[in-house]
From Swiss-Prot:
GO terms for molecular function: rRNA binding; structural constituent of ribosome. CDD domains: Ribosomal_S15p_S13e. This is Small ribosomal subunit protein uS15. It comes from Dictyoglomus thermophilum (strain ATCC 35947 / DSM 3960 / H-6-12). One of its GO terms (biological process) is translation. One of its GO terms (cellular component) is cytosolic small ribosomal subunit.
């Protein structure tokens, strides 16, 4: 369920803005999106795992806040990110 160091590293390299970047909104949103996808798959199998469902809802809320921040701060970066992650239709 959790991301390995290698998987985190790949996501950070793909979405970072410069070579030392690991905390920009893009990177944080991409990492949260991957964790959300994995937890969603887990919950499809384990339907009664309510504790994990609460954690999933918290992650979704955190991602929503970061997306809202990025949308207000730089709309072009926001549009590019949601297209790369496939979040909106």
């Amino acid at each position: 369920m959790a991301l390995t160091k290698e998987e985190k590293k790949q996501i950070i390299e793909k979405f970072r803005l410069n070579e030392n970047d690991s905390g920009s909104p893009e990177v944080q949103i991409a990492l949260l999106t991957e964790r959300i996808k994995r937890l969603t798959e887990h919950l499809k199998v384990h339907k009664k795992d309510y504790h994990s469902r609460v954690g999933l809802l918290k992650m979704i809320g955190r991602r929503r806040k970061l997306l809202k921040y990025l949308q207000e701060k730089d709309f072009e970066r926001y549009k590019k990110l949601i297209q790369e992650l496939g979040l909106r239709k």
